[in-house]
Design a protein with these regions (language model features):
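Switch/connector loops and helix/strand junctions flanking conserved nucleotide-binding motifs
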Residues: 2, 145-148, 196-198, 232-234, ...
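Short amphipathic alpha-helices and their capping/turn residues within compact interaction modules
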Residues: 67, 71, 78, 103-106, ...
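Short coil/turn segments at secondary-structure boundaries
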Residues: 78, 112-117, 127-128, 149-152, ...
Length: 443
């Protein structure tokens, strides 16, 4: 842990030096010339487009490209209603986030306390399901807890998109702020324990899986925590893991509290965990599993022996090195997520315009709309063949159908080739030009 804090301090010093130079990869929020872009309509003819030659960093360049080329496409084809809310200034300037997921009492809150070496406002620990809300642990001038409704409307925080989940969720969401050197570079998301019973799951007053998916798209690392005594993956946990589709590169598995079993039992537990994950993670690659006991107590060497202690220490070092790399990779992750979003918006535009094209001009619109909704999978296949798109990039059919049923397809826009070409140019030329011009601030 000392090495993690030292590295953060070194990077902090390098950042303060790099602010004096002309070229850097980050943009302070207070001096950003683009602070008011998101309050303006980019599609207005009176607005003059700012040339990309005047950008001052990679993040600045992504902001301008989003406003000028990607946001008009998203607004035209209602991407924000179907897939993801429109991005705001704070989404680009946000610190890297790490989300912890797992069943109750697998050590999620204790894990954060272990990294911070102190408790945080609103932290509750116990053998029963203690964390009953989503808690964002981030840097702040003093220790305090901010209610979810307040957090969601603050322009300088990247949580405006959570308003789509309603007041019932926001009452189960809060932000915990405290001054800490680690939190100046990384934000943690503590989640409620995933429930094992179907009855308890249905009593949640909000879309738990949807909220998890929203956070997954914003996070830089997702830690799935397991307890040696809780290896079963419940139906809700399966749905949660399935909602992480498309973010496989962010997922790490942590077998926590592993010093509660001896070496022979640990081998069996590890095998059972890998078997369970193999049925849920639909990927041929093997997920990275860290074994250890991530709390402030000394490792129970009496149970696991000297070999187990050495293994746990090395595993902990590997996990900490993964966490150390997060700020360094944050800029690359922003670019990666931006490109993924642009491709998703393009495919969404193709789908919406295809459905609009299939509608009749005069009679029988209601019947045709119902047929299109019922056979949405076939329509996706037609779009895929027409535009030569990868099948894996298409949205979930059932979720898309659920949202689509509330709209009048005839009101959708036809395909606008100029907008599509603008996004293609952005992916093919503008983003590579920005990357050539600026460097990662942590390099």
């Amino acid at each position: 842990m000392d090495g993690l804090v030292e590295l953060i301090e070194q990077k902090k010093k390098r950042q303060s030096k790099s602010r004096d130079s002309d070229v850097n990869g980050t943009l302070p929020v207070e001096t950003s010339p683009s602070a008011n872009w998101f309050s303006q309509m980019s599609t207005s003819k009176s607005n003059k487009k700012v040339p990309l030659s005047s950008v001052t960093s990679i993040i600045d360049g992504l902001k301008r490209l989003y406003i000028q080329k990607l946001k008009p496409l998203e607004v035209t084809y209602r991407f924000n209603d179907f897939v993801s809310p429109l991005l705001t200034n704070s989404d680009f300037d946000a610190k890297p986030m790490v989300m912890l997921l797992g069943q109750y009492s697998t050590g999620k809150t204790t894990f954060i306390k272990h990294l911070l070496k102190s408790s945080y406002p609103g932290a509750h620990i116990g053998p029963e399901p203690t964390t009953d809300r989503f808690v964002v642990v981030m840097s702040g001038p003093d220790e305090r807890s901010i209610p979810g409704n307040t957090v969601a409307v603050q322009a300088d925080m990247p949580f405006n998109g959570l308003t789509t989940f309603g007041t019932s969720f926001l009452s189960k969401f809060e932000c915990s702020q405290m001054p800490h050197p680690l939190l100046e570079h990384i934000t943690f998301v503590d989640t409620p324990g995933v429930l094992s019973g179907e009855k308890q799951r249905t009593q949640r007053s909000y879309d738990f899986t949807g909220v998890t998916s929203w956070f997954a798209s914003k996070c830089d690392l997702i830690l799935l925590l397991f307890d040696p005594h809780k290896l079963d993956i419940s139906d809700e946990f399966k749905r949660v893991i399935s909602s992480l589709r498309g973010h496989d590169d962010k997922i790490r598995v942590v077998l926590n509290k592993a010093d509660q079993v001896d070496t022979q039992q640990l081998m069996r537990v590890y095998g059972a965990l890998m078997w369970s994950l193999g049925k849920v993670l639909n990927t041929p690659e093997v997920a990275r599993v860290y074994i250890g006991s991530f709390n402030d107590k000394p490792i129970n060497e009496h149970v696991i022996g000297p070999i187990g202690k050495e293994l746990f220490e090395r595993e902990q070092e590997d996990l900490l090195s993964d966490l150390k790399d997060i700020p360094k990779k944050a800029c690359d992750r922003r670019i990666n997520e931006f490109v993924k979003r642009a491709r998703a918006a393009k495919i969404h535009a193709y789908i919406i315009s295809h459905l609009k094209k299939a509608m009749p001009a005069m009679m029988g619109k209601a019947k045709v709309q119902q047929r299109l909704i019922d056979n949405l999978g076939d329509e996706f296949a037609k779009v895929q063949r027409e535009f030569h798109l990868p099948a894996g990039d298409f949205p979930n059919v059932d979720q898309f159908r659920e949202v689509l049923s509330g709209y009048n397809i005839d009101k959708f826009e036809k395909l606008k080739p100029k907008m599509i070409q603008g996004v293609d140019d952005m992916l093919g030329y503008d983003i590579p030009d920005v990357l050539k011009k600026f460097r990662n601030p942590y390099d």
